[in-house]
Amino acid sequence: MGKKQTFASDTSQRSITDWIRALLVLLLGLIIAHLGVTLFLLSALGTDTFTVFIQGLSRVAGLSVGTVHVIVLCMLMVLMLLTTKGYVKPGTIVCAFCGGPIIDFFTWCFKEYINASSGMPVRIISVLVGCAILSLGMSVVINSNAGTGPNDLVAIILSDKLERIEFRWIRMGCDAFFVSLGFILGGTVGVGTIIAIFLTGPMVQFWLPKTKVLLQKIRV
């Protein structure tokens, strides 16, 4: 078996112009992805594993999901800056501060049209469309090569440290931890969570080559 790939990298040689271009693409991906997250949340049928954790914390703290999202990601980012090297990039900072407000904005836009009182067909469609949009946005973020969110870095850092364990098992362990803690705190676990667990990965894999080609065509 060959040496397992690690994820830390040095991007210090990038020009300012390249960073601006990459960060704009990442921001576009964040907007798309968090629209998907919002559709999951509004369906009240469960959401992705990390958002279950954030939702549970928000109910305990009495704060919006977006506000708690920013607080938790900033805490994770500071911890990573203090204990690791090469993982936190400019895009990580953008993810930490922008994701929460985007969720709150889309929640404000759509909460009157999609909610727990909506018909079940509307809520199920919201989950399915949300999963497709979330995975599309994630593929754009990945192809931006500008960094990723602190929540995703948890599994990445652990994978690099625990060299004998495959990344997928570490990711599944992190997902199980977040969803279990979120459920204990009052987050909604439901059919949407199951859909997110089993469909998000394959759909991201479906979108990755397509968004890569598109971004190459527009020279991003």
Spans of model-derived segments:
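Core subunits and conserved enzymes of cellular information-processing
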Residues: 2-220
